UniProtKB/Swiss-Prot annotation:
<comment type="function">
    <text>May block sodium channels (Nav) found. Reversibly modifies the firing of DRG neurons by causing membrane depolarization and increasing the number of action potentials. Shows antimicrobial activity against the Gram-negative bacteria K.pneumoniae (MIC=64 uM), and only a very weak activity against S.aureus. Does not show hemolytic activity.</text>
</comment>
<dbReference type="GO" id="GO:0090729">
    <property type="term" value="F:toxin activity"/>
</dbReference>
<keyword id="KW-0528">Neurotoxin</keyword>
<dbReference type="InterPro" id="IPR002061">
    <property type="entry name" value="Scorpion_toxinL/defensin"/>
</dbReference>
<dbReference type="Pfam" id="PF00537">
    <property type="entry name" value="Toxin_3"/>
</dbReference>
<protein>
    <recommendedName>
        <fullName>Toxin Cm38</fullName>
    </recommendedName>
</protein>
<dbReference type="GO" id="GO:0019871">
    <property type="term" value="F:sodium channel inhibitor activity"/>
</dbReference>
<comment type="similarity">
    <text>Belongs to the long (4 C-C) scorpion toxin superfamily. Sodium channel inhibitor family.</text>
</comment>
<keyword id="KW-0738">Voltage-gated sodium channel impairing toxin</keyword>
<keyword id="KW-0929">Antimicrobial</keyword>
<keyword id="KW-0044">Antibiotic</keyword>
<dbReference type="GO" id="GO:0042742">
    <property type="term" value="P:defense response to bacterium"/>
</dbReference>
<keyword id="KW-0800">Toxin</keyword>
<keyword id="KW-0872">Ion channel impairing toxin</keyword>
<keyword id="KW-1015">Disulfide bond</keyword>
<dbReference type="InterPro" id="IPR044062">
    <property type="entry name" value="LCN-type_CS_alpha_beta_dom"/>
</dbReference>
<keyword id="KW-0964">Secreted</keyword>
Amino acid sequence: ARDGYIVDEKGCKFACFIN
């Protein structure tokens, strides 16, 4: 897994964990 960012439909960025 690695750290990453995803953006929701409102354009907000938040930390996530990408496997």
